[in-house]
């Protein structure tokens, strides 16, 4: 028999309606080992939180979408000093896989800490109201991943381990002697334990849901079901779910639940990397007496119809102003707290954390307060007044796990400082004692006042798991500090998802404290940094610094730091790289102008500015015509605009340098116009056809004093004049949105696109396809490589002849800039670099480190999503492979159309 289920996956057609639908994951947070029941129209869920206190959280929802924590089964566990971080720890242990049941008007939970000895006892608690106090009913021997089951005849059972079962006494005080039995055996191809037992009864049959792993090729983590007409067996087996989802691994372990309307649902968790193990929601359809999970094809659906009308939007995570006399239920302590060492009342509106015990590191520190981090992205910040810390005290905020990224306020001599460090704990296998904490400080800044805002952003999208770290003196202007930290989930360490953690501990003497306020939890703040500008060159606000002679330039063998100012006002280079390092975006304009000056002076020649009154523009049908008059000479540029067949004007625009090499299909279904910049109208140099010589081009009629220029400065100048024309005419006449202009090209035209994007800040998106040496590849990196386009082997019609004279051979290390800084000039706008390693001449070996170094500029300002690179072979030169379609489409959609995607 097939049961009809209303909650089938369904993608609503009208966008606003999506808010009422449930999108998987049901909760993008660490909520492993879920058990769910439905009582009086509410769903109740329990999960594993291990060493965090209070423990065994009870969550409630009316609609399976909005969940809130309504209480905990216990406030602390006291069987061992390990729970107090004394004589060891219980990291990765404590409360595991809990069974939640409702029977005869009472709620019951059963769980067993995954530990040997007394701490391994199984606990059974009960409550009349799950939001209020729970009472310990009994303790008995250890049952691994057990399911409590009340049968219709009044008998009570525990199913545990891999097919083990025993009967409990009616009052749940212990095991009925002689009742232990094996109800099924594991199959030969199944490895490890079958875990996560969930027993239920439906239509007179017994069903046991478990997770299974198999060795066979092509087989994965899966959810299986055993069923029998008799609780003691024999049981038959069926795979009821074998599905991955959303680019993450296969799904398994959880339960099924029926609503008051008779519909059935499954809540099964999925490993999602550093965020932890997250619950997914899916239909459960009874087919031939089996609870089959997922959609009709057996896959986890993205969308589910609403289960019930939502009462209110609630969450298991939250901001907190600490104005209440009790901590919110979204907070948990790492191990048992020391109650006298924290307060919400000693300073009204603040959480006070006091040092109480001298410890060596964060993992030993008591009273670390935590909340789950959430996906796909999240951000949390807090104000910390550290004016009462003592020498040797450490306080701050962490992305806390076995591998942690940590912001620590500490004292160095008489100066307070903030450091960002990466910390990794090593634990003994049995006792979970701390063997070692490896700590690597990535950056330290001196603090200029005795209070600071700290912020950590988390990105848990596919293949991400990154945390970024910030500090602020006013909560408004944020400064990036440290690395973009790769978070990790490691079952051998904490076995939990990464959490936000607030901490304060002492390494010398007790008695110091911090006051914390305004914990703000939400999504990553929308950057206030512009994506595009109306002005061609914001650096025109600054005069170019004087450039030193080549003999004055120091040897710099590594890639120069793109964020460090390099030239003194008098024109002398400071020794090494001892200039001011940019930390604020407000200073980037000045540094970017310095890079532009160096590239023009030593590399390509001057790109001259043009007064608006010297540019005239008109539309001739669909062709843009621009006249530029300088020194009594006029140069005319023409470019036909190809308008899209979809959408409404004004349209985004993609300009192809010498043509558009990207596949036409990337634009056919998008409301994006295209046009081609024919560079020969400015400078007709070509490697493949007859051309004029340097000083004879159309550009040189306007600027005879710049006859030594390289082609890339002149071509960049020409494309900018087309944008001048679009701005002059306006969107009503051109049908073009000048705030969403992109530029792209491949090979030599990929270089051209990169120079155009770098030198015109009105270009929102630059896609440089296979730009090769002289493009994104740093000259320093290509110099030692064989058979690549390096500084000696490039085409010098593109560059100043003096560049070859000045920087050939090992003199390349005297170059005061490199092409990673050309790449960085595109920041804060969007850039995608596409490489092809099959063509060695392109020097992708040099482009990769150049791209990585340049991306640090975007990262410094917290906008690294605006820059990426993809190097993929197996295709002809300048023919984009399908494997690069997704990232290219994502950049086009986001930065030309303003659409966020899963990419």
Language-model regions, residue ranges each:
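Mobile cap/lid helix-loop segments that gate and shape the active-site cleft of serine hydrolases
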Residues: 768-822, 843, 847-851, 859-864
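C-terminal catalytic histidine-bearing segment of alpha/beta-hydrolase fold enzymes
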Residues: 382, 852-903
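Non-catalytic accessory segments flanking enzyme active sites
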Residues: 561, 567-649, 661
């Amino acid at each position: 028999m097939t049961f009809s289920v209303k909650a089938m996956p369904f993608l609503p057609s009208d966008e606003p309606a999506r808010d009422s639908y449930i999108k998987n994951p049901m909760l993008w947070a660490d909520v492993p080992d879920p058990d769910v029941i439905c009582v009086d129209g509410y769903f109740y869920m329990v999960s594993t939180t291990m060493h965090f206190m209070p423990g065994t959280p009870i969550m409630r929802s009316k609609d399976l979408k909005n969940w809130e924590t309504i209480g905990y089964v216990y406030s602390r566990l006291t069987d061992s000093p390990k729970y107090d971080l004394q004589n060891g720890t219980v990291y990765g242990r404590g409360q595991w896989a809990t069974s939640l049941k409702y029977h005869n008007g009472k709620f019951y939970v059963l769980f067993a800490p995954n530990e040997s000895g007394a701490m391994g006892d199984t606990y059974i608690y009960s409550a009349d109201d799950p939001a209020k106090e729970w009472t310990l009913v009994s303790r008995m021997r250890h049952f691994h991943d057990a399911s409590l089951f009340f049968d219709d005849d009044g008998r009570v059972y525990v199913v545990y381990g891999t097919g083990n079962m025993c009967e409990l006494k009616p009052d749940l005080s212990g095991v009925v002697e002689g009742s232990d039995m094996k109800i099924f055996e594991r199959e030969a191809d199944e490895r490890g334990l079958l875990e996560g037992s969930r027993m239920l009864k439906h239509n007179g049959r017994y069903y046991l849901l478990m997770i299974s792993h198999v060795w066979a090729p092509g087989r994965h983590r899966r959810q299986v079901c055993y069923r029998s007409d008799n609780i003691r067996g024999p049981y038959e087996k069926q795979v009821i779910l074998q599905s991955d989802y959303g680019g993450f691994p296969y799904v398994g372990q959880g339960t099924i639940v029926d609503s008051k309307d008779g519909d059935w649902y499954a809540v099964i968790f999925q490993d999602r990397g550093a965020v932890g193990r997250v619950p997914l929601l899916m239909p459960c359809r009874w087919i031939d007496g089996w609870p089959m999970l997922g959609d009709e094809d057996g896959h986890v659906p993205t969308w589910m119809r609403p289960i019930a009308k939502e009462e209110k939007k609630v969450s298991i995570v939250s901001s907190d102003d600490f104005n209440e006399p009790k901590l919110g239920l979204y907070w948990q302590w790492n191990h048992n707290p020391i109650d006298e060492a924290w307060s919400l009342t000693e300073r009204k509106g603040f959480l006070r954390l006091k040092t109480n015990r001298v410890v060596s590191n964060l993992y030993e520190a008591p009273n670390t307060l935590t909340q789950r981090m959430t996906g796909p992205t999240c951000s949390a910040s807090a104000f910390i007044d550290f004016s009462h810390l003592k020498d040797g005290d450490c306080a701050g905020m962490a992305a806390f796990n076995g591998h942690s990224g940590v912001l620590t306020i500490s004292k160095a001599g008489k100066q307070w400082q903030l450091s960002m460090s990466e910390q990794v704990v090593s634990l003994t296998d049995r006792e979970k004692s701390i063997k070692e904490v490896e700590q690597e400080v990535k950056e330290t800044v001196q603090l200029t006042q005795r209070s600071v805002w700290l912020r950590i952003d988390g990105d848990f999208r596919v293949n991400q798991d990154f945390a970024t770290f910030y500090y602020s003196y006013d909560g408004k202007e944020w400064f990036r500090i440290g690395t973009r930290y790769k978070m990790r989930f490691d079952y051998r360490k904490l076995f939990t998802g990464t959490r936000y953690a607030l901490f304060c501990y002492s390494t010398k003497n007790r008695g110091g404290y911090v006051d914390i306020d305004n914990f703000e939890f939400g999504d990553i703040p929308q950057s206030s940094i512009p994506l595009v500008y109306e002005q061609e060159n914001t650096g025109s606000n600054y005069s170019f610094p004087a450039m030193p002679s080549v003999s004055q330039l120091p040897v710099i063998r590594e890639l120069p730091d793109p964020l460090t100012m390099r030239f003194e006002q008098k024109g002398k280079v400071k020794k090494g790289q001892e200039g001011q390092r940019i930390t604020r975006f407000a200073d980037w304009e000045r540094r970017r102008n310095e890079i532009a000056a160096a590239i023009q002076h030593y590399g390509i020649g001057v790109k001259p500015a043009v007064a608006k009154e010297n540019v005239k523009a008109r539309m001739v049908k669909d062709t843009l015509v621009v006249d530029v008059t300088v020194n009594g000479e006029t140069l005319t540029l023409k470019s036909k605009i190809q308008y899209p067949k979809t959408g409404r004007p004004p349209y985004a625009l993609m300009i192809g340098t010498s043509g558009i090499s990207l596949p036409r299909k990337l634009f056919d279904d998008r409301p994006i116009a295209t046009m081609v910049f024919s560079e020969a109208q400015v400078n007709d140099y070509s490697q493949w056809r007859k051309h004029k010589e340097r000083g004879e081009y159309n550009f040189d009629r306007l600027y005879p004093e710049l006859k030594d220029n390289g082609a890339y400065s002149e071509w960049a100048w020409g494309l900018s004049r087309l944008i001048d024309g679009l701005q002059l005419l306006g969107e009503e006449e051109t049908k073009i949105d000048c705030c969403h202009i992109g530029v792209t090209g491949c090979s030599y035209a990929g270089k051209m696109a990169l120079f155009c994007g770098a030198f015109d800040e009105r270009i929102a998106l630059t896609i440089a396809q296979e730009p090769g040496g002289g493009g994104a590849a740093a000259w320093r990196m290509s110099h030692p490589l064989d058979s690549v386009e390096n500084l000696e082997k490039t085409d010098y019609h593109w560059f100043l002849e003096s560049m070859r004279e000045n920087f050939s051979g090992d003199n390349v290390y005297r170059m005061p800039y490199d092409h990673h800084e050309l790449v960085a000039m595109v920041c804060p706008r969007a850039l995608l670099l596409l490489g092809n390693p099959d063509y060695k001449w392109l020097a992708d070996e040099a482009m990769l480190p150049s791209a990585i170094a340049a991306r640090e500029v975007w990262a410094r300002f917290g906008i690294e999503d605006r820059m990426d690179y993809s190097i993929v072979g197996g295709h002809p030169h300048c023919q984009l492979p399908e494997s690069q379609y997704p990232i290219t489409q994502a950049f086009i959609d986001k930065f030309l159309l303003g659409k966020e995607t899963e990419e």
